[in-house]
Amino acid sequence: MTRRLKAAIIGSGNIGTDLMIKILRHGKHIDMAAMVGIDPKSDGLARAARLGVATTYEGVAGLIRLPVFADIDFVFDATSAGAHVENDALLRAAKPGIRLVDLTPAAIGPYCIPVVNGDAHLDALNVNMVTCGGQATIPMVAAVSRVARVHYAEIVASIASKSAGPGTRANIDEFTETTAKAIEAVGGATKGKAIIVMNPAEPPLIMRDTVYTLSQPADEEAIAESVERMVAAVQAYVPGYRLKQKVQFDRIDSPLRIPGVGDALKGLKTSIFLEVEGAAHYLPAYAGNLDIMTSAALRTAEHMAQRMLADATVSA
């Protein structure tokens, strides 16, 4: 049997519970060991207990006191940006070498988009999964960037209001700031901008994302092909990720002024329209925004664990 590394999840809300179900069903190198919350009556903690997972409602302090903590190598943090800073400090003091996968916009560690730069951070002690909008759209910005220099990229992430829990709502500013920075740092754009829309429609609509880039003039077919290859790569761990329609192009011949970028920009505008349907492991299918976050987090941790296990085998 393949050896697996034990993991804990901090945050027993929508994201944490969905991630737990994914690990229990699909974990190859990661084993679900503990669920951490602060509400003793939360559905996530109750569900974890029924599934035989160790639980605590006393936060990170409670996790550290659990007997299983001695065996835990990974912690997924699905709380909030502010809480993650404190959680990282407490865990690092208790176990300096523990790996944290941050599903909040705190961004203590490097930004990680599995299909773009996941392999660059396999040895990092803390990696940041950016945001749901970032996980959905930054691969598209990167797909354009590998064909032509991107001066500016703007993304609009539309999610069902019902899929946005208190953690998401408390982090709106951090969402836009972290996503914009990651569009630049990981996506390769000179300047990035992010907008989130919470759609109150009933019945709830699945996640939809729009990506606009302004790049140097380039071969449109090459960009379209690059986008399609990137979509296929994301679908390897998020099957519900897909293009809503063909990539659209517009030649910009009149100079544009983009603050922070330049005053006389011309080039190629690329418009990419996406939708993300969730796998419905715990949450409804319309919550593709949460599904892509938990899927990306597990993908990242699996690759990190695989590296750790391989290194341990070599050392032995």
Swiss-Prot record:
The UniProt keywords, alphabetically, are: Aromatic hydrocarbons catabolism, NAD, Oxidoreductase
Q: Give the reactions, separated by semicolons, that this protein catalyses.
A: acetaldehyde + NAD(+) + CoA = acetyl-CoA + NADH + H(+)
Matching Gene3D superfamilies, A to Z? Dihydrodipicolinate Reductase, domain 2, NAD(P)-binding Rossmann-like Domain
Known InterPro entries for this protein?
Acetaldehyde_dehydrogenase, Acetylaldehyde_DH_C, NAD(P)-bd_dom_sf, Semialdehyde_DH_NAD-bd
Q: Which GO terms describe its biological process?
A: catabolic process
For the protein in the UniProt heading, the enzyme class is oxidoreductase
The Swiss-Prot or TrEMBL record annotates one GO molecular function as: NAD binding
Q: Does the keyword Oxidoreductase apply?
A: yes
Q: Does the keyword NAD apply?
A: yes
Q: Which family does it belong to?
A: Belongs to the acetaldehyde dehydrogenase family.
HAMAP family linked to this entry: Ac_ald_DH_ac
Q: Can you say what this protein is called?
A: Acetaldehyde dehydrogenase
